[in-house]
Every structure is written in structure tokens, then in C-alpha cells.
């Protein structure tokens, strides 16, 4: 059995409806996943209003699960994962970024909590798949512009073009009180040489003024009716803008629920998806498949089904620790573009965590490997 990410996806496959991801599309995702380390957070982007069951693959790299070390070039001494051997210029820059991010005490290590790679998959993937790349800030990060520029210069291999930098600064300065940048993306796979800004802290009330200030080339009448119907059913909105010399027409609004990893809120997700179904943005079969995806998986009764590295870790931790896979809906995104009908996408998450019994304190601990390992210490 593989020690790569495809082993995790294989465990999730029985719970992933072919209405969302066809067997052929899943095979294409697996071709990419078997080249990547077993990151503890990955998932699928599914289009809800189209009958085609296609999906893109997302993978989150973190320090805690060792995936950051693999990207940095120090976590794969045996060369098990092909990303360590990719010679494409984009991957060479990604590894340079990973090495800087992995330096203890560096500004990137302090500011950036994780990175997210998104692979667009339309058919059989290229032998060397090229992802879009997102840096996601720590909660307490300063979000300093200089750090953003340093990160993007590493990724692009050159500083931001002056016109792009000027427009990015204008978008950040135009944020209302409470608004902040949560992530910044370099869209390598789409050959867009600008920046994607992911912004939190906006609301249906502050969004029209913000989009007007930054020069979005659309009218609020194109998105306000749908957002007004959706907003009461979500906890938080996030905005994604593609920023080059100008703000690009394509606009994304993410809809999040404030649910915990311990318990999924399928009722509220169902209510949100029903609103989209009523407006023709979500097929009924896909709505049902999304709700059915949500759940969890552990293999205490079948440890032989675990990927080898999890089996080894589980045996080393002993009988009081258990690897768990959570299946969640991370968020739903509404996409608006002037002159086009809106589109809805769902982002499914597959999250690997550990459940440990802290016998000293008489409680259970649910978290990453280091957290659970610490709870088991005598």
C-alpha cells in the first residue's frame, strides 16, 4: 500500500458519490495524489450546478504533519515523493519557498501558518502537474506588506510588477474596519501573473462600498440578490479577488459555517444548499451527495487497512491513540462575473487527526500528532 496522499484518498473513496466525482475523475486526482506526501488536510473542489462530475484537488502543507519538511527538501531523504524530483521551474521555486518557510525563527515561519496547493484537473493530468499556490497567514500574523512581497517574489522568481503592487496596496488600504487579508495566491496553473487576495471581515453591508472603492468592473445588482438570500444561513463570508494592473472581473464569495471538527452541522449545510438548489445553482443529486459525504472514519477494527506510516505510528503510540479521518464541507463558494450567471462550488475537506486518551487528566485529546503524543507522555 502507498505511503503517499493517494492512500488517504482511497480510504475516502467509498464515501465520495460519483455524482460529485466520477470514477474517471477520481482516477485523475489519484494520479496527482500519489506524487505527494500524506498531508493531513486535503480535499476536492466540486462544481454544483453542472452535471459533469469533475473535481480539482487541494492539498494543505503544514509543519505538524511533516509535509512542510517534504516541500523544503529535508523530509524525503529517500525520494519517495515525486514532487522532490520535479524539475519544472515552478516546482523549483516552490521548494525554495518551502526551504525559507521551514527556517526556524524566519519571518515566513512566524507569519505563515500553512500553504495550500490547488491542482486544476480537467482530464488526464500532466506528468508534472502545476498547481496554484496560496500562503495562509497565522491568526496573529502582522500581515506586513513586505513579508507578502518577499513570499510572492520567491514564488514568481521576481518582485511584483509595480502596477500590480500598486493595485494590491490599494485593495488592502480600502478594507473596512475589521477586514484583513487571510491568504494570498499565485495562480500558476492559470497563467495569471497577478495576485489572488483572500479577504475576511467583510459583510453584505460593507461589500458594495468596498468593491466600488477598489474598482471591481461589475454592478452590485449582479450579486446582491443571491447574497442576501444566502447570508442569513452562514456564519462568515470571505472574498477572493484577482488583482493585476486592475481588479479582474471574476469575484468569489466564500460561505463558511462556524462548525467544529468534532461535530458536523449537516442541517445548516443542507439549508444553505437548498437555497442554491432553488435558484438553479446546485443540482439535487449533488446536494444530497454533499450531505452524505460528511462523517468520520477510524479503523481500530481493521488496522491492516491503514496506510503503512499511520499503522507504524499507531503501533508506536499504543492502544490509547487512534488515527481518525474527518470528512467535512469546508465552504461553499459563489462565483460572480459581469455578464455571466453566478456559479456555486463546494470545497470538501478530508482531515486526518488523532484521538488520544490522556489518562493522567482523565480526558480525551483530539488534535494533531504532536498534541496527542504529548497527552500520552507519562
Where are the regions a protein language model picked out?
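An N-terminal, globular interaction/scaffold subdomain
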Residues: 1-120
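Ser/Thr-centered flexible coil motifs
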Residues: 19-22, 161, 283
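Short small/polar-residue motifs
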Residues: 36-47, 109-118, 176-185, 232-240, ...
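Short, low-complexity cationic-aromatic patches
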Residues: 46-52, 123-127, 186-193, 244-247, ...
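Extracellular/lumenal glycan-associated surfaces
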Residues: 56-62, 131-139, 191-206, 250-259, ...
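Extended intrinsically disordered, low-complexity coil regions enriched in Ser, Thr, Gly, Ala
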Residues: 61-91, 142-163, 204-222, 266-281, ...
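Extended, well-ordered protein cores
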Residues: 97-202, 206-219, 228-233
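C-terminal structured domains
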Residues: 206-378
Amino acid at each position: 500500500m502507498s505511503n503517499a496522499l493517494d492512500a488517504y484518498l482511497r480510504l475516502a473513496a467509498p464515501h465520495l458519490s460519483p455524482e460529485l466525482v466520477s470514477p474517471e475523475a477520481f482516477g485523475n486526482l489519484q494520479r496527482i495524489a500519489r506524487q505527494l506526501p500524506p498531508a493531513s488536510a486535503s480535499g476536492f473542489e466540486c462544481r454544483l450546478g453542472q452535471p459533469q462530475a469533475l473535481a480539482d484537488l487541494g492539498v494543505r502543507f503544514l509543519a505538524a504533519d511533516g509535509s512542510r519538511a517534504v516541500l523544503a527538501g529535508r523530509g524525503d531523504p529517500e525520494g519517495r515523493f515525486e514532487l522532490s524530483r520535479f524539475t519544472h521551474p515552478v516546482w523549483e521555486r516552490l521548494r525554495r519557498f518551502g526551504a525559507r518557510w521551514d527556517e526556524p525563527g524566519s519571518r515566513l515561519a512566524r507569519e505563515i501558518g500553512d500553504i495550500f496547493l490547488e491542482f486544476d484537473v480537467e482530464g488526464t493530468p500532466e506528468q508534472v502537474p502545476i498547481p496554484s499556490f496560496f500562503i495562509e497567514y497565522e491568526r496573529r500574523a502582522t500581515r506586513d506588506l513586505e513579508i507578502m512581497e518577499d513570499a510572492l517574489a520567491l514564488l514568481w522568481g521576481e518582485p511584483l510588477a509595480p502596477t500590480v503592487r500598486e493595485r494590491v496596496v490599494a485593495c488592502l488600504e480600502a478594507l473596512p474596519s475589521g477586514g484583513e487579508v487571510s491568504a494570498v495566491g499565485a495562480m500558476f496553473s492559470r497563467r495569471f501573473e497577478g495576485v489572488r487576495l483572500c479577504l475576511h471581515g467583510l459583510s453584505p453591508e460593507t461589500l458594495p462600498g468596498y468593491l466600488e472603492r477598489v474598482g471591481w468592473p461589475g454592478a452590485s445588482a449582479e450579486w446582491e440578490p443571491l447574497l442576501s438570500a444566502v447570508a442569513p444561513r452562514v456564519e462568515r463570508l470571505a472574498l477572493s479577488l484577482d488583482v493585476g494592473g486592475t481588479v479582474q472581473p471574476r469575484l468569489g464569495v466564500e460561505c463558511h459555517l462556524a462548525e467544529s471538527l468534532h461535530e458536523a452541522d449537516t442541517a445548516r449545510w443542507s439549508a444553505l444548499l437548498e437555497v442554491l438548489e432553488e435558484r438553479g445553482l446546485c443540482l439535487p443529486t449533488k446536494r444530497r451527495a454533499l450531505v452524505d459525504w460528511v462523517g468520520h472514519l477510524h479503523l481500530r477494527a481493521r488496522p491492516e487497512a491503514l496506510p503503512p506510516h499511520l499503522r507504524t505510528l499507531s503501533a508506536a503510540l499504543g492502544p490509547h491513540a487512534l488515527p481518525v479521518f474527518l470528512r467535512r464541507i469546508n465552504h461553499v463558494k459563489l462565483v460572480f462575473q459581469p455578464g455571466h450567471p453566478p456559479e456555486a462550488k463546494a470545497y470538501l475537506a478530508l482531515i486526518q487527526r488523532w484521538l488520544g486518551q490522556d489518562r493522567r487528566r482523565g480526558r480525551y485529546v483530539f488534535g494533531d500528532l504532536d498534541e496527542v503524543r504529548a497527552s500520552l507522555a507519562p
